[in-house]
Amino acid sequence: MEFEAVRISPGKYRGDALLVGLFQDGPEPALALAALDAAVAAVVLEVISEEEFKPKSRQKLTVRVGGDTGLRKVVLVGLGEQAKYKPESLRQCIGEGARTLKAIKATTAGVWVPPLGEGGEEATVEALVEAIRLALHEDRRFRSKKSDSEENGNSNNGGENKLTKVSLVVAGEGDYAAAVRRGNILAEGTIFARELVSAPANYVTSVTLAEQATAIAEANGLECEILEKEDCERLGMGAYLGVAQGTDLPPKFIHLTYKPAHSAPRKRIAIIGKGITFDSGGLSIKPAKGMELMKVDMGGAAAALGAAKVLGQLKPDIEVHFIVAATENMVSGHAIHPGDILTASNGKTIEVDNTDAEGRLTLADALVFSEKLGVDAIVDLATLTGACVVALGNDIAGLLTENEELARQIRAAGEASGEKFWQLPMEESYFEGMKSVVADMRNTGSREGGTITAALFLKQFVEKTPWVHLDIAGPVWTEKQKGYTNRGGTGFGVRTLVRFVLAQ
C-alpha cells in the first residue's frame, strides 16, 4: 500500500473513495464540506440529512456519488468533539474509516481530516499512516488459501484489502515524506510484534526468535550477540537456565545493540522483553482451558524486537540495548521442581515456590546482565502476572518503578502512542511474604498484590540503575476488533518504547 501527501483542494481529488473526518461539534456540514466539488457536496449533504448522521466518534456513513465527478464514494467518519481531538482519537476514528474503505473494495482513496492542534499536518499525516496500516493488517500466514476470493470472504478482518494507494490531502508546506516514512515504520514494527505474538509456539521458539533478532540486526545495522547455553552458564545465569532446563529446545539469550553511527550517544538505554515462547506452567501446570493462549508469553520480547526494528531505521542518537532471555516453560523429567533452589547471576538464591512464576526468573538474569552494560536506564516489559489483568483489565498495562521521572516519560510516550499505563506502588513491606527459610527469597508471595510482589522480586536484581517494570499481560492480546486494533496480538508496547527512546 502506497501513501502520499498531496497539496490539493479535497474537491480536486479523483479516485474510488474520499474518507472525510467531521467533528461532532464542528461547523454545519454544508460549511465543513464546502471545499468538496459542488455536485459531490450536494449528494453528500442530502444523504446526511436523510440518514440524520451525527459525526460522533467512530460513527460512519458511506455515500455513493458516481456520475462524472471522478469519485465513486465518499466515506464520512465522526471525529468526536474538537476538544478531545488528539493523535490517538484520530487514529481510532480513521482506523474505523479504513475498514469501510476495505469493505467497499476501494483500490484508491483520499483522506481529508482537520490537522491536529499539536504537531500540525506532519503529525496528522504520521497518525493517518499508522492508523490505516494497522487497521488493514491481516495475518494470513497460516491459511491454506491466501486470498479472500479463495476463502469466499472467510476472514477475521472484514475481507481482503484491495487498497493500493492512499492520498492524504494537506493544505500547507511540510516534510510530509518524512511523516509518511515514520508512520509506515512505526506500523511495520507494530505489525512485526503482532505477528510474533499471534504465531503458535511451534513456529515461534527460542531458536526462531533468535533468528528473527539476527535478521533485524542484519537489515538495520544493529550489533547482534546470541548467548548459547554454555555462555549463560559461564555468566552464572542459574535462574534463566533453571527455567530452560525443562525444554528440549536450546535457550537463546538475545542481545541486540543499536549505536548511533556518527556521534557519541547522548544516553544509553536497555530494553528487556520477557521471552517465554510457551508457558505450560511447568510442573505447577496450568489448567488446559486457555493454555493455547500461553503462546503470548513472549509479548514483551515481541515489543522489544519490534522497537529494535523501528529504531534501527529511525536512527536516534541514543544507544539502545535490546535483551531477551528466550526459552519455554515446559513439563519434562528435566524440569525444575517446586522447592528447587536456583542461583541467579548476581549470586542471590531463589527458592522456586511455583514453577509457573517462571518469567521473573528469566528476567532476573536479564536485569543483572543489563545493568552490567552501564546503561542510564532499564525498561522491562513482561506478560508477568494475571493479577495485573484482574486489577487493570485487558486494555491497561501496569507500571512499577521507584523513579518518578521514568514513570512520567513512559506515561507520556504511552499517551502519544495510544497505549495506556497505570502506576502501581512499590510497597516494600509486601516483600516480607517472599522471604524464604532456606534461600534469599521465594519466587512468589501471597495471592494478594501479585503484580506488586512480582516487581519487588525483580527489584532484587537491579542495584543502582533507574529501572521501570511494565506488566503488559492484559493489552498484549485482544479478542475485540476496534479502531485500528484487530483480533489477536496487538503489538502493544512497540510504539511506546520507540517514542520513549526518541524523547530522551
UniProtKB/Swiss-Prot annotation:
Record-given protein name: Probable cytosol aminopeptidase
Cofactor: Mn(2+)
Binding site for Mn(2+) 2: 274, 279, 297, 358
Function text: Presumably involved in the processing and regular turnover of intracellular proteins. Catalyzes the removal of unsubstituted N-terminal amino acids from various peptides.
HAMAP family in UniProt: Cytosol_peptidase_M17
Assigned keywords, A-Z: Aminopeptidase, Cytoplasm, Hydrolase, Manganese, Metal-binding, Protease
Protein source organism: Gloeobacter violaceus (strain ATCC 29082 / PCC 7421)
InterPro entries registered for this protein in UniProt: Leucine_aapep/pepB (IPR011356), Macro_dom-like (IPR043472), Peptidase_M17_C (IPR000819), Peptidase_M17_leu_NH2_pept (IPR023042), Peptidase_M17_N (IPR008283)
UniProt-listed PROSITE patterns: CYTOSOL_AP (PS00631)
Ligand binding (Mn(2+) 1): 279, 356, 358
Gene encoding the protein: pepA
CC per GO annotation: cytoplasm
Protein's cellular compartments: Cytoplasm
Superkingdom to which the source organism belongs: Bacteria
